[in-house]
Amino acid sequence: MKIIRKIVKSCKDDEMQKPNPVSAPPDDDDLWLPPPEYVPLSEMTGKKNMRNFCINGEVKVCSPNGYSFRIIRHILSSFEGVYSGNRRMIGLVKVVIGLALSGAPVPDGMNWVYKIRRTLIFQWAESSGPLDGEELEYSQEITWDDDSEFVGLQMRVSARQCHIQGRLWCINMNSRACQLWSDMSLKTQQSDEDKNTSLLLE
């Protein structure tokens, strides 16, 4: 056990703040949860409260014994309560983390690294979202440890407004990203002025 503990410590990032522990997942945690209410985006027609963001996102999964998405989903279900970043951009962070984890990981020692670098279009509901010109630098670690297994998520997201043509963030309703957004309780609603647009409520 001491050897495992030493291994675990070696794949943690000393620069990260003290991680937030998460309790063990229930037996039925692997059940699929429906995604939040939204419709697939086609083309932005409404320009109200719309922002283009240049995004860099990284999620590093640290686990000496491997990991399953059941545990990752359980860790992310606590995201709303432990998020330590700018609350005006929590919706953006949830979207980026979901999209990053939907990609293919790159092994890095005992870690698996998921990265996303993209320009994304977001549209927020009235009085929601970041201030004009506001930027984000967010990093946090959330862990799950039950003395027999350790899984840690190291998350980094940077976002700045830019004028590069952005892509729409919403993808296939049955994708892994939608499951992760559901786990993180992503809050959205359909736009009144554009039925093909989802507005972020956070």
Curated annotation (Swiss-Prot):
Signal peptide: none annotated. It is a peripheral membrane protein. GO terms for molecular function: structural constituent of virion. A motif (PPXY motif) lies at residues 35-38. InterPro entries: Rhabdo_M, Rhabdovirus_M_sf. It comes from the Viruses. It is found in: Virion membrane; Host endomembrane system. Pfam families: Rhabdo_M2 (PF04785). GO terms for cellular component: host cell endomembrane system; membrane; viral envelope; virion membrane. Keywords: Apoptosis, Host membrane, Host-virus interaction, Membrane, Viral budding, Viral budding via the host ESCRT complexes, Viral envelope protein, Viral matrix protein, Viral release from host cell, Virion. Plays a major role in assembly and budding of virion. Completely covers the ribonucleoprotein coil and keep it in condensed bullet-shaped form. Inhibits viral transcription and stimulates replication. Plays a major role in early induction of TRAIL-mediated apoptosis in infected neurons. Belongs to the lyssavirus matrix protein family. Most abundant protein in the virion. Late-budding domains (L domains) are short sequence motifs essential for viral particle budding. They recruit proteins of the host ESCRT machinery (Endosomal Sorting Complex Required for Transport) or ESCRT-associated proteins. Matrix protein contains one L domain: a PPXY motif which potentially interacts with the WW domain 3 of NEDD4 E3 ubiquitin ligase (Potential). Homomultimer. Interacts with nucleoprotein and with the cytoplasmic domain of glycoprotein. This is Matrix protein.
